[in-house]
């Protein structure tokens, strides 16, 4: 048996897609287990740039199965479009499997997402307006429509009518907005379901069979742990559980998980609103944003930038049970005279070592920094830690010391051959 979970340790955009693509070379199955098409990631492979939102990274390799688990909320329109774009790049998608238990995002979810966000005004969460939250709300309220329902014309019609009636009343009475048309949604989305029908199955069986056969299975988390609805900066979070969602979102037992790989950038970024203790609002932040091309894959929005926050990543390590660390984008910091690491917070003269649940408490905290000398040398061709200039190497070593976790890989650029392996995670699960 060999299973590895990949999770983001910050607020998403840590480079999980790249690491998933890299580690998937040793996997037979790659599966997503939560989130939706709000979680874009970019993969550079075979001289092509692939921008994925719903489809797992393994779809690029015909010998692997790519699984969208039951914990993912699926926008059929978005998924059909993504598969069409991949086909234009020569990726067939024949190795894709979609859980029949995955919930479906429909147009009324997207409309409700936008109306709810607009109604909050200055208190908005900063969602991607893709209907993720409302779809998970329907799931929790037990009125959601699943992939299995979408494929059954009679069931889909019955449930869509009931749901749309309730949603239209909400649109008109609560938000003073126009109702949506049943026929338009029904015909369009039933056809999307028929186009996806060939991929739909009980993916829990697929995953557990692969694990029981001793095959390597890689689970790909979306967003980051600081966006986890339970462990993140609530309410400025997503609607799912990147931290521990793999067991329920993929339908595999906790006893079948071997390693949890945490992915972090050598600095911090965030899209949307919410607390960000190490945020840089000066020219240093602009330098890092431009050097790192820090603009959202899905939204195109400039990401907020800050120094590496060890308090955040230690919190993520603890709540997700992280066993190994992948550190990305070290090269982005090249050219800075000094670099900083947040090692703790300070509040009213007292040192705070752990990330607080109260956002009011957090707003009263100031970061405590360690300052290290920067480096000017080009590190994009480095293959080992010894190839790094002394200051860059010391920066990496200090991060791992503060986190108390072994470094699995470090990256000095966006391409796959710029990800350098210190230890093969698949060797670890085979021991």
UniProtKB/Swiss-Prot annotation:
It comes from the Bacteria. Binds 1 Mg(2+) ion per subunit. Mg(2+) binds at residues 13, 40. It catalyses: IMP + L-aspartate + GTP = N(6)-(1,2-dicarboxyethyl)-AMP + GDP + phosphate + 2 H(+). SMART domains: Adenylsucc_synt. It is an enzyme of class 6 (ligase). One of its GO terms (biological process) is IMP metabolic process. GTP binds at residues 12-18, 40-42, 303, 329-331, 411-413. Its main location: cytoplasm. Its cofactor is Mg(2+). GO terms for molecular function: adenylosuccinate synthase activity; GTP binding; magnesium ion binding. Its EC number is 6.3.4.4. Pfam families: Adenylsucc_synt (PF00709). Keywords: Cytoplasm, GTP-binding, Ligase, Magnesium, Metal-binding, Nucleotide-binding, Purine biosynthesis. Homodimer. This is Adenylosuccinate synthetase. The gene is purA.
């Amino acid at each position: 048996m060999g299973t590895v979970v990949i999770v983001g340790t910050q607020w998403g955009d840590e480079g999980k897609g790249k690491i998933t693509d890299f580690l998937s070379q040793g996997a037979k199955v790659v599966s997503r287990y939560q989130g939706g098409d709000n979680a874009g990631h970019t993969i550079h492979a075979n001289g092509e740039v692939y921008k994925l939102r719903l489809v797992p990274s393994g779809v690029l390799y015909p010998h692997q199965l790519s699984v969208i688990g039951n914990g993912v909320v699926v926008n059929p329109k978005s998924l059909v479009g993504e598969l069409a774009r991949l086909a234009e790049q020569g990726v067939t998608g024949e190795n894709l499997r979609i859980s029949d238990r995955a919930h479906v995002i429909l147009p009324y979810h997207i409309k409700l997402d936008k109306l709810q966000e607009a109604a909050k005004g200055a208190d908005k969460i900063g969602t991607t307006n893709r209907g993720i939250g409302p779809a998970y709300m329907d799931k929790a309220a037990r009125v959601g429509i699943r992939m299995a329902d979408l494929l059954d014309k009679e069931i889909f019609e019955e449930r869509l009518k009931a749901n749309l009636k309730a949603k239209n009343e909400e649109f008109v009475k609560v938000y003073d907005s126009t109702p949506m048309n049943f026929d338009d949604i029904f015909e369009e989305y039933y056809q999307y379901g028929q186009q996806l029908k060939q991929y739909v199955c009980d993916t829990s069986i697929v995953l557990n069979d692969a694990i029981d056969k001793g095959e390597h299975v890689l689970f790909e988390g979306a967003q980051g742990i600081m966006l986890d609805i339970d462990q993140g900066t609530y309410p400025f979070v997503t609607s799912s559980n990147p931290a521990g969602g793999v067991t329920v979102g993929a339908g595999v037992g906790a006893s079948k998980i071997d390693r949890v790989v945490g992915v972090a950038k050598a600095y911090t970024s965030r899209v949307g609103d919410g607390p960000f203790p190490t945020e840089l609002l000066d020219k240093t932040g602009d330098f890092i944003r431009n050097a790192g091309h820090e603009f959202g894959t899905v939204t195109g929005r400039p990401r907020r930038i800050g120094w590496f926050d060890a308090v955040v990543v230690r919190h993520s390590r603890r709540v997700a049970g992280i066993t190994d660390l992948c550190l990305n984008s070290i090269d982005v910091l090249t050219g800075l005279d000094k670099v900083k690491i947040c090692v703790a917070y300070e509040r009213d003269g007292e040192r705070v070592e752990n990330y607080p649940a109260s956002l009011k408490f957090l707003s009263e905290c100031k970061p405590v920094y360690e300052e290290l000398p920067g480096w000017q040398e080009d590190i994009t061709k480095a293959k080992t830690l010894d190839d790094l200039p002394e200051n860059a190497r010391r920066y990496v070593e200090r991060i791992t010391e503060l986190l108390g976790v072994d470094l699995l890989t470090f990256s000095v650029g966006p391409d796959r051959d710029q990800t350098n392996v210190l230890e093969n995670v698949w060797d670890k699960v085979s021991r």
